[in-house]
């Protein structure tokens, strides 16, 4: 990769992260460390991720996505939960800009203006459980350690389900997801109560996947057995590493032995669909340490593995250490090598690298995640959760106190440019990429021709490919997908 490409990547990182602020936070939840994976290689020269000082290029708005919103001090614990969601007045100039965009789009203006991003006849429910026992050294998502507020929060979430019962229209709910925070701190009866209430208010007769994020040390045999009875059929276990020293550095509350045991216990309890999270790019823990973690993960045989690159955020323990000069991100070449190691190891073991951060055995792609990437409607319940009805984004306040108190959600209608950019940002993260015929039908021939024209330098180097009428970044090159996306965004 030549110096020009590296420089371009640095600019890309800044631009794409700014634009990414406009994606829903529930999408961002599943991207979680999203741009940590393919954009982190440029963190040393780029500002912090959304919620950490980034401002979107077009207009100010909340960081987009359902689960973890950075901080507002929420309670006496002072946990870092840097909130990117702010209660704000509506901006009348948005309508003027949308009309200007429509006129600029020419003959396709009306069609694009009436286009809904919801392209999939399914819907998802997301429940945000923000509580944590301990703050991880890398985490700047919205969280609270006030565990005694679990039941008042659950009651407020049940009220929100009732108030928003018409949000998804007639579309059936196909996926349900509990994210956090640490949802495995939630009693099974509370989880079951939320699912039961949702089933009374929405069409959940065809649910295909119900996921709960969990910490390894929470997964006792009794808890797992009770969890199965609630309807949870997929666990996302936040292991991060199978190295005790690395876990200690990250301030994780489990050990490597507990991590492995949690997977075995989940199998014994009857869970046949497991995904585990791993983090790479941790200074001092690459090479053989990462390889051992990957080998241990493969020996446990999860159906799905998510691998994220560590990002050092300002309002975290790692960020404070970095500010003092005693902690720094790994070098760009190290990031590239570790990404390659993850890709090569997992694909050789039969996992499909189907999205920047995600690997699955055949038939076990994350269905809830895929709904975000392909424009399905979803309803986010809980503090900091975001929702999308096909045309508008809605977001809840990132505060347990204010959420329980009934704070009104914010909302914004997507402009044509927002829709186009989000289409690129989500689809080009996947191995399938975008279909050129579909893109033309949705956004017009002129935009599609511009995509083909401007992506040519990347296709000539093999960083992107156009095959069978589809544009995609090959999985082995996904570390550079940010640069490809930046080329195509409308700013």
Place the predicted regions along the sequence by residue.
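Short hydrophobic targeting helices and cationic amphipathic motifs
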Residues: 15, 29-31, 36-39, 97, ...
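Compositionally biased, low-complexity flexible segments
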Residues: 47-107, 111
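C-terminal scaffold of the Radical SAM
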Residues: 122, 143-166, 171-445
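Short amphipathic alpha-helical interaction segments
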Residues: 445-457
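Short, amphipathic alpha-helical interaction segments positioned at domain boundaries
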Residues: 478-491
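A short, conserved structural fragment
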Residues: 460-469
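Local cysteine-cluster metal-coordination motifs and their immediate loop/turn environment
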Residues: 130-141
């Amino acid at each position: 990769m030549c110096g020009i490409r590296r420089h371009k990547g640095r600019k890309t990182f800044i631009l794409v992260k700014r634009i990414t602020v406009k994606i829903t936070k529930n999408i961002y939840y599943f991207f979680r460390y999203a741009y940590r994976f393919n954009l982190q290689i440029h963190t040393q020269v780029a500002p912090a991720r959304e919620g950490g000082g980034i401002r979107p290029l077009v207009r100010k708005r909340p960081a987009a996505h359902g689960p973890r919103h950075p901080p507002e001090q929420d309670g006496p614990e002072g946990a870092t939960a840097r909130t990117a969601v702010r209660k704000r007045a509506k901006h009348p100039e948005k309508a003027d800009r949308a009309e200007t965009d429509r006129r600029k789009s020419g003959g396709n203006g009306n069609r694009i203006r009436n286009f809904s991003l919801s392209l999939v006849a399914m819907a998802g429910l997301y429940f945000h459980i923000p509580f944590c026992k301990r703050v991880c050294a890398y985490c700047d998502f919205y969280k609270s350690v006030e565990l005694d507020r679990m039941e008042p929060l659950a009651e407020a979430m049940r009220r929100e389900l009732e108030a928003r019962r018409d949000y998804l229209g007639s579309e059936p709910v196909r996926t349900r997801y509990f994210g956090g925070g640490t949802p495995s701190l939630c009693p099974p009866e509370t989880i079951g109560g939320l699912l039961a209430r949702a089933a009374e208010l929405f069409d959940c007769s065809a649910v295909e996947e119900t996921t709960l994020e969990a910490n390894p040390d929470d997964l006792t045999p009794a808890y797992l057995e009770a969890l199965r009875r609630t309807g949870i059929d997929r666990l996302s276990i936040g292991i991060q590493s199978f190295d005790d020293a690395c876990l200690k550095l990250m301030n994780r509350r489990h050990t490597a032995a507990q991590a492995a045991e949690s997977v075995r216990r989940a199998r014994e309890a009857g869970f046949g669909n497991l995904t585990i999270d791993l983090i790479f790019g941790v200074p001092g823990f690459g090479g053989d340490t990462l390889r051992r973690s990957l080998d241990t993960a493969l020996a446990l045989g999860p159906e799905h593995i998510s691998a994220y690159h560590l990002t050092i955020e300002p309002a975290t323990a790692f960020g404070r250490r970095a500010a003092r000069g005693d902690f720094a991100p790994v070098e760009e070449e190290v990031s590239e090598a570790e990404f390659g190691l993850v890709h090569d190891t997992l694909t050789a073991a039969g996992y499909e690298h189907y999205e920047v951060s995600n690997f699955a055995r055949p038939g076990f792609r994350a269905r809830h995640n895929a709904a975000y990437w392909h424009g399905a409607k979803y309803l986010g319940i809980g503090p900091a959760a975001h929702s999308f009805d096909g045309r508008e984004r809605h977001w809840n306040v990132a505060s347990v106190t204010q959420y329980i108190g009934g704070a009104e959600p914010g909302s914004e209608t997507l402009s044509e440019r927002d829709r186009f950019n989000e289409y690129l940002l989500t689809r080009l993260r996947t191995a399938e990429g975008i279909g050129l015929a579909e893109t033309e039908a949705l956004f017009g021939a002129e935009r599609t021709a511009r995509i083909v024209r401007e992506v040519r330098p990347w296709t000539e180097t093999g960083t992107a490919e156009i095959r069978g009428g589809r544009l995609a970044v090959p999985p082995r090159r996904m570390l550079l997908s940010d640069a490809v996306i930046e080329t195509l965004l409308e700013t």
